[in-house]
Amino acid sequence: MMRGGMGNMNNMMKQMQKMQKEMAKAQEELGEKTVEGTAGGGMITVIANGHKQILEVKVKEEVVDPEDIEMLQDLVLAATNDALKKADELSNSTMGKFTKGLNLPGGMF
């Protein structure tokens, strides 16, 4: 009886180690994937990676109005939030396969 139990425990440990390696690889890949958030009909574009790091902000020249800087700020904010939301979705879909069925609190993955 004991021997079978230890074998199961060893198998479980091997599976957990394999899953840890796969999760680490998935985390690394998230940093390489990008998402794009936009606002103002594409006048502002924000590019972020799967780690929610902003990589680039693009502003089309015609949206820059020195008389209305507030609108430009609002558009940059909206595009940034859009990019971060998409980065969250990417992270959840990528990492969620590892936590499916674990019933983690607070919507973690």
UniProtKB/Swiss-Prot annotation:
Under the heading InterPro entries, the entry gives:
YbaB-like_sf (IPR036894), YbaB/EbfC (IPR004401)
* One MF annotation (Gene Ontology) recorded for this entry: DNA binding
The protein's matches in Pfam families, at most eight in alphabetical order, are given as:
YbaB_DNA_bd
Annotated protein name in UniProt = Nucleoid-associated protein BA_0020/GBAA_0020/BAS0022
Keyword terms of this UniProt record = Cytoplasm, DNA-binding
Assembly, in brief, is: Homodimer.
Write out the GO cellular component annotations: bacterial nucleoid; cytosol
Name the domain of life: Bacteria
Record keyword Transferase present: no
Q: Which family does it belong to?
A: Belongs to the YbaB/EbfC family.
Annotated compartments:
Cytoplasm, Nucleoid
Q: What does this protein do?
A: Binds to DNA and alters its conformation. May be involved in regulation of gene expression, nucleoid organization and DNA protection.
Keyword field contains Cell wall biogenesis/degradation: no
